[in-house]
Amino acid sequence: MACDFLMVQRYENIVLAKVMKERLLDATSITSLGEALVAECDRTAKISLVIDVSEVGYLSSSMIGKLVAVHKAAKLGKGRVAIAGLKPTLLQMFKITQLDKLFEFMPEAEQAIMTYRRKPL
């Protein structure tokens, strides 16, 4: 399923996936985004996936579940996932559920890309 609100840029094994939707609530959007992100993990061995959510204002619990599935897919390929641009209220949700220990969080996508370039897998 294609995801028309996801822009993907590749820099060798670093993949920037920018989510261009403010609210991730409906099942169709969540499914298509989750499938597109997992496909990137499957396509790129030792992926360093940066998910830029700077335009996202709300994540449903289902979307958080999809992000966990994306993390698992990346780990299967010996990769890693950073979430960039997460708003403080959304970051708090990850902390409450202790999922902040699962992901790397970066203030901006550019910082995540630079960090991953300095520390390749």
Language model feature labels by segment:
Residues 23-103:
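Amphipathic alpha-helical interaction surfaces in cytosolic regulatory modules
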Residues 3-35:
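STAS-typified acidic loop motif
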Residues 104-121:
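A charged, well-structured terminal subsegment
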Residues 17, 40, 117-118:
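Short regulatory "switch" loops immediately downstream of catalytic or recognition motifs
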Residues 20, 54, 110:
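Conserved catalytic submotifs in the C-terminal HATPase_c
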Residues 1, 72, 83, 108-111:
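Residue-level detector of intrinsically disordered, flexible termini
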